[in-house]
């Protein structure tokens, strides 16, 4: 049977918080079976916030969690990493209210987990298996999940910007066949420089810079190093989706499809899914019959 996973040893990282602009210290700590992903805010007495849809309180520009007044913001890139590497159980210590943004992708977090090492545990890994189609809509935007033997994300974005249009706004990734590490993990968040400058005048997005995002002028990419992928914009949105879906508490087996989606619509979809327990099941799988192949340390995989 496929087993649950944690990390082999404690590992630390430091980075800037995109909201505060302050340095954030983060420590990943191995956790016991069935612990799940849990955040611990060391700056407020070690209070805990579980990484689950039930605790989502923020869906504007990023995904944030809250438990009894204690918040953890911008969790989606780290959650995307845990999903891709099959990490079920880990304690994430922070000395601030937000996960550090690093370079705006999940690649630094992938490296961090790989540096810690991945440990299989004794308990069987639980998968969230979609059995029926569930759909949510908001204006002309929509998102749905349906039954599928594996994990697949199909997305179309619609940004009225020359470079985004040129890069391709539609993509489907079958994670049973295509590698998250090579195809998705290095895709960075993006936004208009004029919007960032406006927010910073209001003391918002103080940590945002070209070191952690693709900065757009009205018609071009401002970063000197250009793009990491030809279609980096839509790939980053898929990275976000993988992270948001992991707030179900287990790796999803199903096909996510969306048009002009974001954190709000993703969270609405999770809420509807969880409210309809007859449309999904929690299952375990034999290694040979697994619909998902997770990263293994003996893979010849590099970023």
Curated annotation (Swiss-Prot):
Its EC number is 3.5.1.108. It comes from the Bacteria. One of its GO terms (molecular function) is UDP-3-O-acyl-N-acetylglucosamine deacetylase activity. Pfam families: LpxC (PF03331). Zn(2+) binds at residues 77, 236, 240. Pathway: Glycolipid biosynthesis; lipid IV(A) biosynthesis; lipid IV(A) from (3R)-3-hydroxytetradecanoyl-[acyl-carrier-protein] and UDP-N-acetyl-alpha-D-glucosamine: step 2/6. SUPFAM superfamilies: Ribosomal protein S5 domain 2-like. GO terms for cellular component: membrane. Keywords: Hydrolase, Lipid A biosynthesis, Lipid biosynthesis, Lipid metabolism, Metal-binding, Zinc. The active site is at residue 263. Its cofactor is Zn(2+). It catalyses: a UDP-3-O-[(3R)-3-hydroxyacyl]-N-acetyl-alpha-D-glucosamine + H2O = a UDP-3-O-[(3R)-3-hydroxyacyl]-alpha-D-glucosamine + acetate. Disulfide bonds: none annotated. GO terms for biological process: lipid A biosynthetic process. The keyword Lipid biosynthesis applies. Belongs to the LpxC family. Catalyzes the hydrolysis of UDP-3-O-myristoyl-N-acetylglucosamine to form UDP-3-O-myristoylglucosamine and acetate, the committed step in lipid A biosynthesis. This is UDP-3-O-acyl-N-acetylglucosamine deacetylase. The gene is lpxC.
């Amino acid at each position: 049977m496929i087993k649950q996973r944690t990390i082999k040893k404690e590992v630390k990282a430091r980075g800037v918080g995109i909201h505060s602009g302050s340095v954030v210290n983060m420590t990943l700590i191995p956790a016991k079976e069935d612990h799940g992903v849990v955040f611990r805010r060391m700056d407020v007495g070690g209070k805990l916030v579980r990484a689950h849809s039930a605790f989502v309180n923020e869906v504007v520009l990023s995904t944030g969690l809250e438990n009894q007044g204690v918040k953890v913001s911008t969790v989606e890139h780290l959650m995307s990493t845990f999903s891709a590497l099959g990490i079920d159980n880990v304690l994430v210590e922070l000395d601030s209210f937000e996960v550090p943004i690093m370079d705006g992708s999940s690649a630094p977090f992938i490296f961090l987990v790989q540096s810690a090492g991945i440990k299989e545990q004794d308990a069987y890994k639980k998968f969230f298996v979609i059995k029926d189609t569930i759909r949510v809509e908001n204006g002309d935007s929509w998102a749905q999940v349906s039954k599928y033997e594996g994990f697949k994300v199909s997305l179309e974005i619609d940004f009225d910007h020359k470079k985004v249009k040129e890069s391709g706004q539609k993509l489907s990734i079958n994670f049973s066949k295509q590698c998250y590490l090579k195809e998705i993990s290095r895709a960075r968040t993006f936004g208009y420089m004029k919007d960032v400058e406006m927010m910073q005048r209001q003391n918002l997005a103080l940590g945002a810079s070209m070191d952690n995002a693709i900065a757009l002028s009205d018609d071009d990419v401002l970063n000197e190093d250009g793009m990491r992928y030809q279609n980096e914009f839509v790939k980053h949105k898929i990275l976000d989706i993988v992270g948001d879906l992991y707030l179900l508490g287990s790796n999803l087996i199903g096909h996510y499809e969306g048009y002009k989606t974001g954190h709000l619509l993703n969270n609405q979809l999770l809420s509807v899914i969880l409210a309809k327990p007859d449309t999904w099941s929690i299952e375990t799988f034999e290694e040979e019959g697994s619909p998902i192949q997770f990263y293994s340390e003996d893979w010849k995989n590099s970023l």
